[in-house]
Amino acid sequence: MKLFCTIRAMTTVGSIAAVAVGVFVSPARARPQAAIAAASNSASALGRWKTIDDATGKVKSIVEITEQDGVLTGTIEQLFDPPVPHPTCYLCTGAKKDLPLVGLQVLWGFHADGNSWTGGMVLDPETGKIYRGSLALEDGGKQLRLHGYIGIPLLGRTEHWVRAE
């Protein structure tokens, strides 16, 4: 959140300078994605992540993880080879029922807990089920370990997402 606040404050003076990564963006091109890109480094879960199909090893989607008020959320940004054009979360219930998968929030409520993020929830759009979850960076920040579970973490399932370049 500090990065977003700093960048928003600096936007009002005419340019954005992200000193940590040496990025300059003109005010006309300033977007929240610039803040995400600047924050995407080996110590941060923020940024774009490739989700990998366990069975085929192929990339299924890109999920963008953002932070607001210290809480991480993740939204599907792009789908690769969807089974139907413009797929929706037809198995979801409640407010997410039949929402388009692109733009759907699938991670929410994750808080920093040392070198990981815990206390969040994970939506599996293929089943419509919601799980408790934890996130942790691996391989020098190149991979994100997502562990979803019901009840106790021991009985869950883990996926590894790869940072998108």
Protein language model regions, located:
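Bacterial N-terminal signal peptides that target proteins for export
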Residues: 2-14
